[in-house]
Amino acid sequence: MSMKKLILSLIVATLALPLFAQTASKTLLNLDKTGVAIQGYDPVAFFTDKKPVKGDQKFLVKHAGAIYFFASKEHKDLFKADPAKYTPEFGGYCAYGVSRNKLVEIDVDAFQIVDGKLLLQYSKGVRDDFNKDTKGNLAKADANWVGLLDKKGK
C-alpha cells in the first residue's frame, strides 16, 4: 500500500471512529416497564434446562441496563461469571424481526440456541421461518442490529 493510501485510510478511520463509538455505547433492550428482561425468565435455564423457566426475584442480577431473574443461586452465579454467554442476542428482541429490520416482541417458548447464542423469536412459526435460512437470517440480523441501535438505541 502506498504511503498516500495509508494516510488516507488512517484519516477515514479516524473520522469514522466517533460514529462507531456512539453506536457501541448505545443500548437497545426488550424490557418490561420495570426493567426486567426476557419477561422474567431465567436466561441460564435456556441453556441448562433446554426450556424457559421463570426466574425468582430473590435471585436477580442487574446487568448492562437490564434486570435478570434466575431460578436458582447456581444459575445466578453462572450468569455473573459469564453474562455474555447467557444474555439474549439483539437485546432480547425477535431475531427474525431484527433480520427484517424490525423490533418485535417475543414468545419465550420460541427460543433457540444457535452457535451458543440465545435467540428469541416472536412465535414457533416465525422460528420455523427463520430456520429456513438460519445463517442468512442471522447475518441479516447482525447487519441490521447496528442500524437499529443507532436509530432507536439510548
Predicted segments, located by residue:
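Sec-dependent N-terminal signal peptides
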Residues: 6-15
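Charged, low-complexity intrinsically disordered segments
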Residues: 22-154
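C-terminal segment of classical bacterial N-terminal signal peptides
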Residues: 15-21
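N-terminal secretory signal peptides that target proteins for export/translocation
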Residues: 1-3
